[in-house]
C-alpha cells in the first residue's frame, strides 16, 4: 500500500478527530467540519458495526503515527509476542520509532516532517547518522540534529511550535544543543486517552 499524499485534513475528517497531521500544536481550523466525513454525503455518517468501529480505531492510530498497513500489522504481531498487555505494547512500539521520538522532542512540527528529517540524514542517534524512520530507539539513547542541519528553517520553526506544547515526561531535551535523551518508554497513562487500543486487539484477534 502506497503512502497517502493527499490532503491531511481529509484523513482527520475521515476519523472524526484531529490527528495532528497538519500542525504539531494548532487545532484544526473551526471552518473544517471535523465531525463530517469527506465527500458529498459526509454529513451523514452511517452507524458503524462492531467491526467498523474496530477498523476505524485501527486506521486512526495507524494514520496518527504515519505507518503503512503492513508495518502496522507487523507491529501488532511483535506486540502480541511480548509479555504484558498487547495493546499497550503496540503503543510503546509505535512511540519508540525514531521519527516519532524526533517529533516528541520537538525537532519536527509533525511526524511526517520528522520522518523526512530522518530520511534526509539530519538525525543522529548516539552520534551516528540513522536514516531509517522505523529505527527502534532504546532507553537512554541520545537523539540529536546533525551539525550541518542545525540551521534549517523548518527545525527552528518546529522548536518554536514545540514551546507551545508540553514536553512528554519520557524525553529530555536540551534545545541549546539540539539534542534529547529518550529516558524510557511511555506508560499507558502517559499517552492519549482518545486511543482505544483494546478495539485494535479485538480486530486482529478475529
UniProtKB/Swiss-Prot annotation:
Coiled coil: none
GO molecular function: rRNA binding; structural constituent of ribosome
Pfam families, sorted: Ribosomal_S4, S4
Sorted UniProt keywords: Ribonucleoprotein, Ribosomal protein, RNA-binding, rRNA-binding
One GO term of the biological process aspect: translation
Residue span, S4 RNA-binding domain: 96-156
InterPro entries listed in its UniProt record: Ribosomal_uS4, Ribosomal_uS4_bac-type, Ribosomal_uS4_CS, Ribosomal_uS4_N, S4_RNA-bd, S4_RNA-bd_sf
GO cellular component, as recorded: small ribosomal subunit
Function: One of the primary rRNA binding proteins, it binds directly to 16S rRNA where it nucleates assembly of the body of the 30S subunit. With S5 and S12 plays an important role in translational accuracy.
Alphabetical list of PANTHER family matching this protein: 30S 40S RIBOSOMAL PROTEIN, SMALL RIBOSOMAL SUBUNIT PROTEIN US4M
Record HAMAP family: Ribosomal_uS4_B
Complex and partners: Part of the 30S ribosomal subunit. Contacts protein S5. The interaction surface between S4 and S5 is involved in control of translational fidelity.
Family: Belongs to the universal ribosomal protein uS4 family.
Protein name, UniProt field: Small ribosomal subunit protein uS4
Species per Swiss-Prot/TrEMBL record: Photobacterium profundum (strain SS9)
Lineage of the organism: Bacteria, Pseudomonadati, Pseudomonadota, Gammaproteobacteria, Vibrionales
Gene: rpsD
